[in-house]
Amino acid sequence: MLKRAFELKGYHVVEAEDGQQALDMARRYHPNLIVVDLNMPVLDGLETIKHFRKLEGEGDHTPIVTITAYDVYGMEEAAKENGTNAYLTKPLDLDELDRALKGLGFIV
């Protein structure tokens, strides 16, 4: 559903199966936006965000949208401390996704 929503907006989407693959793909493709699920195998979403931000170093940062079905107390703060720019919960509301993307400067 999420991939299709982005494709309908004209975005090219590349999917990763796990956090490590997401990092490898980010190095290779240099995306304009990263969408991370907190519940991923190999490296979870928080670890993936943390490693990605370390790879980026100083300067401009690729926007990261974090999505989760496990919205437990403190999780949003932890995601933001690790470098996420927008935090959304499942079930995903596509209007909420649009607002988050607009807030990050994307045309939706």
Predicted regions and their residues:
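Charged docking surfaces used in two-component/phosphorelay signaling
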Residues: K3-L8
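Short hydrophobic/Thr-rich beta-strand motif most characteristic of the beta2 strand and flanking loop
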Residues: G10-E17, M25
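Acidic catalytic/metal-coordinating carboxylates
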Residues: E17-Q21, D44-H51
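C-terminal output helix
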Residues: L92-L101
